[in-house]
Each structure stands twice: as C-alpha cells, then as structure tokens.
Amino acid sequence: LYSSSGKKYLDFVQGIAVNSLGHSNDYLIRAINKQSKKVWHVSNAFVIPEQEKLAKKLTKNTFADFVMFQNSGTEATEAAIKVARRYFYSKGKPQKNRILCVKNSFHGRTLAAIFASGSKKMTEGFGPKVQGFDHFEFGNHKSLKKSITNKTAAIMIETIMGEGGIKVVPNWCLKELRKICNKKKILLILDEVQCGIGRSGDFFAFEKSKVKPDIVPIAKGIGGGFPIGAVLMNKKVASGMTAGTHGSTF
C-alpha cells in the first residue's frame, strides 16, 4: 500500500484481521464481478443460493448444524447472547440468562457487547449498565467456578484474547471449560471473530483442542474485506431460535 505522500507500506493490519486474501485478490474480483451482474440484495426473508452454499460449507467443515448470518462481528456476538438466553427460555428456565465473560475482554462495540467485555475503558460514559453479565479473571479457575450461579446461561470467551493482550487459552483449559459447562449444564460460547478464519493456522483457534463449543460468533476474515458476520451453533441450542426471534436486513 502507498500513503498520500507515496510512502510504501507492507499491510500487516489487513483492515484489522479482515482482508484474509489480501487486496485485489483475483478470485474475489471474479466472484464480485459475477454477482454484480445478477441480483444485488433481497434480504434474509428469501432463500439466497450463494448464502445457502456458504452455510453448507460452514456446517460441513465445523461443529455447527446451523448458521445465522449477520453484518458484523459485534452483531454476531450479540446474536450469540440471544441464542444462549433464548435456549434456556425455550426450556422453561428464563432465569438462566446471565453470561459469564473474562474481565478486559473484547466482544464488540455495541451496547451489550461492551458490557460483556468487562472493561471500564469500553463502558465509561455510555450510561446505565446493561444487565446480565458477570466476569472472572483470565486464567483464574477459582474465580471462574465461583462466578457460576444458577442464573448462568453460558460462558463466553475469546479463544485468543485481542484487546486484553494476546493471551491464548491453552487447549487443556478449553477442555476444562467444556467439562465445567457440561457439569453445570450451561453453554460454551467461543468468540472467534478476530482469531478465527485461519489466523491461528487452523480454521478456528480452538480446533486443536478437539473441543466442541455450543455457539461460535465469527466475522472479519470470513468476508475477505466485506462486512459479514455469522453465528454458528449446534442443533440443541438452535432449537430455541424459532421464526421471528432474530433477523438481519443483510
């Protein structure tokens, strides 16, 4: 890339982990050019063949049985929260609505997402606190276990933390998280919005652990430079998302 003064840069930022195939990729150019001569947009109220194709690829190659598409990463994490809460509501347990997150994590810039992040820097000046979130210290298993209550619906954690410092959740820790969630009968949400889509060497950063989460929000690299997010989920938790419980224009 070149600045306005002609200075040359190697782009390792990649639009903050978005341009997974770089700039002006031939494959993306051909795909965009082909689609631009067809239907542009009809909303998710209709069947979209290319969207179905992507959903099938995602479910075929991941743990997921269902996919809900969004516009961005923060919408994907907000939708993940809705999926978790709605699941327990559909099971007659509406009191199980709290999401347990890591202090100083990052799950997006919308209102619920910033309070999920548990960071004063993120929430300062944005009015009344959004309820429904509890927090524990990264790597502190006693803090984690102590924070789980009969109102906890899910644990949501970045597989590799971004804003809070590049902290990798070890594979053994992911396995323990899965065991804890199974024992407490709560859901495991692994936020792969920034660390996913090949950035760790695998499609998802959690793959080497062999852990199967219940819900995974993704975005950034999946669009190759275009705004797209998605929530991946298993059949069990998807059962709560009936017609009309969620939607997205794009």
What is each model feature region?
Residues 1-250:
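Conserved N-terminal phosphate-binding loop of PLP-dependent enzymes in the Aspartate aminotransferase
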